[in-house]
Amino acid sequence: MSASFSPHTITLIKSTVPLLAEHGTTIIEAMYHRLFEDPQIEALFNQANQKNGTQIHALAGAILAYARNIDNPGVLASAIERISQKHVGYAIHPEHYPHVATALLGAIKQVLGDVATSEVLEAWGEAYWFIANLLKDREAVIREGIMTKNGGWIHWRRFVISKRIPESETITSFMLHPEDGGPVVPHQAGQYLTFRFDAAGMPGMKRNYSISCGPNSDHYRITVKREHGTGASAFLHDQAKVGTIIECTPPVGDFFLPSVIERPIVLLSGGVGLTPMVSMMEQIAEAYPDAQVWYVHGTQNRETHAMDAHIRALVSRHKHMKATTFYTQRSEADDAEAGFITIDWLRANTPFQKADFYLCGPRPFLRTFVRDLIGAGVPAAQVHYEFFGPMDEEMAA
């Protein structure tokens, strides 16, 4: 990834870094206010992340990081891939980018005032369209790859809930088949679906849920924890029945197993973060008989532990697969380790520096293990993780 920005453009962008550090969130708030004057544009965004401020904070941090690295945009390659995958999931298309450009530049002028000269705005316009064109090009490649496969689709597609499976006291799995009776594009184990819910009280609400079954052309399975409140998880748990229709876009995401497994694999999850791991384990059990796999999961207790019997069955089918569970509230009868997963335990019981780690779980879980694994000597390129919600600068680092 290389950019042909002039030295003058680079100087202008870098001159705004202190202002972005101070006023970045205000600029992004103003940008979204402008964008959301158009209801069709507003409907593209996850409003929950708008209301709690996480998206505003994350985007402000991303723009600041871009400004600081304007002379070395190659450091943003992984972010470009993650955002492109997310945009395909949210059905964002090339025609939406000019709206963002107008809103962003208008917000910069509104917040920075006279400091945002015509030269500064021109430089930021150039910087925006450089990134926007990278995203559009990558998104086009992703969509083409989906559409060339049997069962592929691009926009929102209607699925029928064909089965509900209680997995724990707070977690339920939902089997999904296309309403049109056609095939589905096989996902890569670890990817997710983006859903649009139009039930009463949450029009246009969007959520990402990892696919929790192995790749196939017939159906998907998602496994959802009942969260507090009245959002998508409450709708699925309390209102969605067998026969209920829900809409989603095709599987996307940059968190998945490689086509060729060259190193031992450690799957590490916390709570409902087990969902992409189950998908990976199903694929490994089916297609990678020689892969060496350690699955380590942490949860509160037996009542909160989802899919335990299914995971044990997968382990029994594969001669090189091991699974260990940690309960923070363990009883004497539980076949689990007591307490929390630790780096010392992983170092002693897995291949560690020789392994590829795949992580999914709550934000504190990920922040701790991404940082500590790398700090303990696992190469950063061997630490892969999935996080739902806007990625803050600390996580992205």
Curated annotation (Swiss-Prot):
Single GO MF annotation: heme binding
Cofactor: binding comment: Binds 1 heme b (iron(II)-protoporphyrin IX) group per subunit.
Positions contributing to NADP(+) binding: 271-276
Residues annotated as catalytic: 97 (charge relay system), 139 (charge relay system)
Entry binding sites for heme b: 87
Site positions per UniProt: Influences the redox potential of the prosthetic heme and FAD groups: 86, 386
Record keywords, A-Z: Detoxification, FAD, Flavoprotein, Heme, Iron, Metal-binding, NAD, NADP, Oxidoreductase, Oxygen transport, Transport
Cofactor(s) for this UniProt protein: heme b; FAD
Limits of the FAD-binding FR-type domain: 154-258
CDD domains, per the entry: FHb-globin_1, flavohem_like_fad_nad_binding
Catalytic activity annotation: 2 nitric oxide + NADPH + 2 O2 = 2 nitrate + NADP(+) + H(+); 2 nitric oxide + NADH + 2 O2 = 2 nitrate + NAD(+) + H(+)
Domain Globin stretches: 4-140
Top enzyme category: oxidoreductase
InterPro entries: FAD-bd_FR_type, FNR_nucleotide-bd, Globin, Globin-like_sf, Globin/Proto, Hmp, OxRdtase_FAD/NAD-bd, Riboflavin_synthase-like_b-brl
Site (Involved in heme-bound ligand stabilization and O-O bond activation): 32
Any one GO biological process: cellular response to nitrosative stress
Enzyme Commission no: 1.14.12.17
Protein family (similarity comment): Belongs to the globin family. Two-domain flavohemoproteins subfamily. In the C-terminal section; belongs to the flavoprotein pyridine nucleotide cytochrome reductase family.
Free-text note regarding domains: Consists of two distinct domains; an N-terminal heme-containing oxygen-binding domain and a C-terminal reductase domain with binding sites for FAD and NAD(P)H.
Cross-referenced HAMAP family: Hmp
Stored NCBIfam families: PRK13289.1
Function field: Is involved in NO detoxification in an aerobic process, termed nitric oxide dioxygenase (NOD) reaction that utilizes O(2) and NAD(P)H to convert NO to nitrate, which protects the bacterium from various noxious nitrogen compounds. Therefore, plays a central role in the inducible response to nitrosative stress.
Name by which UniProt lists this protein: Flavohemoprotein
Gene source species: Xylella fastidiosa (strain Temecula1 / ATCC 700964)
